[in-house]
Amino acid sequence: MYYGLDIGGTKIELAIFDTQLALQDKWRLSTPGQDYSAFMATLAEQIEKADQQCGERGTVGIALPGVVKADGTVISSNVPCLNQRRVAHDLAQLLNRTVAIGNDCRCFALSEAVLGVGRGYSRVLGMILGTGTGGGLCIDGKLYLGANRLAGEFGHQGVSANVACRHQLPLYVCGCGLEGCAETYVSGTGLGRLYQDIAGQTADTFAWLNALRCNDPLAIKTFDTYMDILGSLMASLVLAMDPDIIVLGGGLSEVEEILAALPQATKAHLFDGVTLPQFKLADFGSASGVRGAALLGHGLDAGISYEA
């Protein structure tokens, strides 16, 4: 059996897959994000529970928020206790088995490239538009991670100067410590903040969407601004990576208005003659991360380092 664990800021999901990568069972529990010892004990306990249920020792793959460096050290995670820790190495010592680990957005991309809507395409770019923004690039079914495992952290690219000037955008401070990261505008949190600044009132993404569908002028202005920012980011990714397909996940990807406007918004920032990639919704949605983690444990992606 193959186990995938998707670690979030508030929850941990463990899923069990058979040898054909068909889902057999899954469950969730709270993330003990402040105490590393409690976190590791929780993971070990849940994996042993899965072993007992399956009657065998399954392979283990972990998807988590943050950058996993080449030596397995986790940095820039929103789960505080994981930063500067070698999670896979430490868990492997507890379990006495190999543990694979990767960034959750990269696992999303891998899942969709190998098993999902990106299957059959050579160059698959996965992109999450949710609480945060990030993704991953798969080439012929393998993750491209880069020299420092940073490939896919495009949420921390700066917003282009022409877009910032055109809309007189405020410089939002990102959780990474920088200002003006694309994530601070195109994530769900960023869109809500953008609407608050334009409308001059406290509101969230849900309030914005309701107002947009009622043809509120300020909501429409927010939408146009948002699509210009997102289109510029997408165009930069098209120029840098030239994917066959861009697979979208996260809550904002399910907003019909955004998905419908995205190709034209991207094209507006590209020179004439450029062929756009296909834009498609993920097949597995929020389950892509845990499925991608199982793929790491399965050993189908040789680009990930394993800790034994």
From Swiss-Prot:
PROSITE patterns: ROK (PS01125). Belongs to the ROK (NagC/XylR) family. ATP binds at residues 4-11, 132-139. The gene is agaK. This is N-acetylgalactosamine kinase AgaK. One of its GO terms (molecular function) is ATP binding. Transmembrane segments: none annotated. CDD domains: ASKHA_NBD_ROK_NAGK. Involved in the pathway of N-acetyl-D-galactosamine degradation. Catalyzes the phosphorylation of N-acetyl-D-galactosamine (GalNAc) to yield D-galactosamine 6-phosphate (GalN-6-P). It can also phosphorylate N-acetylglucosamine (GlcNAc). PANTHER family: N-ACETYL-D-GLUCOSAMINE KINASE, ROK (REPRESSOR, ORF, KINASE) FAMILY. One of its GO terms (biological process) is N-acetylglucosamine metabolic process.
